[in-house]
Structures are given as structure tokens and as C-alpha cells.
């Protein structure tokens, strides 16, 4: 397949000889347009970019200072949109020779054939994978699936083939450093961008010592983005609870002259809960999960979830109290049980709303 219409984007900071090996491999495997970004490298490393620029197929973009991998990628995307009108897409590659050129070509060809954004994913079960990388990927993928609702085998892969139609969006999202790649995945979800995964070789050179990834700072930036969905869901729930309680008090005070006893409580509780539920539904649909589900259908599913959840709260609380023989007069233990049940149902509600009520219909093909 002709790859002249695919640009390779290659961000690099303080490279060594491996950068030239990467470029030679890409050229040997049919790529004819490489956008190399010097992200503020030190003067003693600039000769690698000069050597690379001697190839007519290589265009070098320079950052005067280190701006981060995300900024380098976005700068290249913007350059391609303005200067490569015939490019059908790009494939991003790391400059440390961890992406084999055959895998890069496979991802680019798959993107051209399907029109889908394509991720080159590593197999972290291989024995030569550093333990830190293996455990880190497992944790990140699990957290990503739980709190974002996307099943991705390798959330930090730098090998990504991206159709031109997605470049304008992806060049405008936030994040200038390693967190940008996580923001890209989140943008794929919220904008319903279909994606596929292609298995690639898992290569670690010298325990990945050449990586500029800062373990604590960059990990915090990434996890902060992943947990943002859950944080917004928590805020939405708290605001709805405040509205629920406030409306109950207002209605109770306003209607006590015409209603009394059970009728007053029932009208106040049901009305307050209904209005606060509608508010919670709207916030979750528009601001938390950014769902494109039809409003009526999503609302029906929301209440289908809410009603059983109410009974589950009662049955679980009562069941635990009975099973463990908690005395009815022991208000502290009963309160602890109720709080634990509420926390359990809160996580369950988040998961069900994310994966069913407001489910984003990203389509991912089977791994090849």
C-alpha cells in the first residue's frame, strides 16, 4: 500500500543515535513524509536533527524551549493541516526505537483501510517487560475502564494512526505534556470517535531509561484526568442531594397548612426527589458523561435504575443488620452499615449510568 499520503509525526527531546535508526527504518518501510519535532533539545544534541534534515523526506520543526510531548504533537498536527493538503492521516511514533517500523506501517495501513483511529498496543504479559511498566499499565487500564468506561489495552501507547478528519479536534484539546495522550483518549470517547487496536511488538531498551516520563508528576496529571469523570459525578450527586433536602424543607414548610402527617411527608419527599432526580439526570447526561443518547430513552433508563436502587438500599441495609445481628438500638453500627451500603450503591450507580444509561457508543474492533 502506498504510504505517501501518511505523515509520520516524531516528537523528540535530547535524542541519541536511536533517533536516526528510527528515521532510517521508517524510510525503508515506505514512509516518505516525516515531521520531526525538536522539543527544545540541548545544543549538544542538535546535530541529530541536522543529520535527519538532510533527508528530503524529513521536515524538522523546532521549539526554542521544551514545551512537552503534547505540545509537539499538536504543533505537528497543525502544521500538517496547513501544509499537507493531500495527507489522509498521520501516525505518531516515539523516537527511542521502541516502535518497530513494520508495526508503524501496519497501523498506518489499517487506518487508511478503515478510516478509524488505530492504536498500536503492546503485550505487557511478555517476560521482558519491566515490572514497573507491567503493573503500571494494568492499574491504569483498570482505572480507565472503571472511571472512564473505555476498554483499552495500552493507554500510554505512543504509536497512534490518526485520520485527517480527527486532527482538527485533537490539535485543540488541552495538555502539553504526557497527559495529552490521555486527553486524546478522553476526546475519542466524548466525541464518539471509532478506534481499533493493532497488536505490536513490545520493546523496552535499557529498562526504558531514555524516557522523559516523570513518574510522580506526569502520573498525577494522567490520573487526575481519568478520575475527573468520577469527581464530576460526585459533585453532581452532592448538588442533587442539597436540592433534594432544600426542596423537602421548603415544601414541608409551605404545605403544612393544607396537609399533615403522612400525606405532607409523602408529597414533600416525592416532589423533592423527582425534581432533584431530573436535575441529577441533566447534569450527568450533559456535564459528566456527555451522552448523545436520546433524552427520552436515557431518562427512562435512569429511572429504571433509580427505582430498584431505592429497594436495594433498603434490602441491603436490613439484610446486613439481620445477618450480623446488629441491635436495633445500636444507632452507630446501623449508621455505619447504611453508609457502607450507600457507598457501594454509589459506585454501582456510577458504573451502570456510565455503561448503560448514558453509554457512549464508541466502536472498537477486535484486536488483530
Question: Language-model features: where?
Answer:
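Hydrophobic helical membrane-anchoring modules
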Residues: 1-2, 173-256, 273-277, 282-308, ...
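Conserved short acidic donor-positioning loop in nucleotide-sugar-dependent glycosyltransferases
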Residues: 14, 39-41, 67, 76
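Acidic helix N-cap motif at the loop->helix transition within catalytic regions
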Residues: 18-21, 42-52, 102
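A conserved acidic beta->alpha catalytic loop
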Residues: 38-47, 65, 97-98
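Conserved donor nucleotide-binding strand/loop of the catalytic core
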Residues: 50-84
Amino acid at each position: 500500500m502506498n504510504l505517501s499520503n501518511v505523515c509520520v509525526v516524531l516528537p523528540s527531546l535530547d535524542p541519541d543515535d536511536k533517533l536516526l535508526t528510527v528515521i532510517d527504518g521508517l524510510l525503508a518501510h515506505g514512509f516518505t513524509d516525516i515531521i520531526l519535532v525538536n522539543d527544545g533539545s540541548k545544543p549538544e544534541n542538535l546535530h541529530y536533527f541536522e543529520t535527519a534534515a538532510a533527508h528530503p523526506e524529513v521536515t524538522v520543526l523546532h521549539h526554542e524551549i521544551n514545551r512537552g510531548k503534547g505540545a509537539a504533537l499538536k504543533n505537528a498536527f497543525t502544521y500538517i493541516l496547513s501544509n499537507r493538503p493531500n495527507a489522509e492521516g498521520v501516525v505518531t511514533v516515539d523516537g527511542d526505537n521502541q516502535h518497530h517500523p513494520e508495526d508503524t506501517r501496519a497501523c498506518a495501513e489499517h487506518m487508511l483501510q478503515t478510516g478509524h483511529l488505530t492504536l498500536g498496543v503492546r503485550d505487557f504479559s511478555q517476560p521482558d517487560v519491566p515490572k514497573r511498566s507491567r503493573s503500571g499499565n494494568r492499574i491504569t487500564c483498570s482505572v480507565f475502564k472503571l472511571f472512564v468506561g473505555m476498554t483499552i489495552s495500552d493507554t500510554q501507547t505512543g504509536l497512534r494512526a490518526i485520520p485527517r478528519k480527527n486532527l482538527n479536534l485533537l490539535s485543540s484539546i488541552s495538555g502539553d505534556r504526557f497527559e495529552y495522550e490521555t486527553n486524546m483518549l478522553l476526546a475519542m470517547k466524548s466525541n464518539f470517535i471509532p478506534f481499533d487496536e493493532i497488536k505490536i511488538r513490545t520493546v523496552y531498551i535499557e529498562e526504558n531509561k531514555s524516557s522523559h516520563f516523570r513518574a510522580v508528576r506526569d502520573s498525577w496529571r494522567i490520573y487526575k484526568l481519568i478520575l475527573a469523570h468520577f469527581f464530576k459525578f460526585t459533585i453532581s450527586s452532592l448538588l442533587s442531594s442539597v436540592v433534594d433536602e432544600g426542596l423537602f424543607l421548603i415544601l414541608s414548610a409551605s404545605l403544612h397548612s393544607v396537609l399533615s402527617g403522612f400525606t405532607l411527608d409523602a408529597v414533600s419527599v416525592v416532589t423533592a426527589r423527582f425534581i432533584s432526580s431530573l436535575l441529577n439526570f441533566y447534569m450527568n447526561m450533559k456535564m459528566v458523561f456527555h451522552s448523545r443518547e436520546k433524552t427520552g430513552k436515557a431518562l427512562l433508563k435512569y429511572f429504571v435504575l433509580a427505582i430498584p436502587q431505592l429497594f436495594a438500599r433498603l434490602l441491603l441495609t436490613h439484610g446486613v443488620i439481620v445477618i450480623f445481628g446488629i441491635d436495633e438500638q445500636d444507632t452507630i453500627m446501623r449508621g455505619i452499615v447504611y453508609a457502607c451500603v450507600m457507598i457501594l450503591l454509589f459506585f454501582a450507580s456510577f458504573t451502570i449510568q456510565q455503561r448503560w444509561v448514558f453509554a457512549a457508543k464508541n466502536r472498537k474492533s477486535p484486536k488483530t
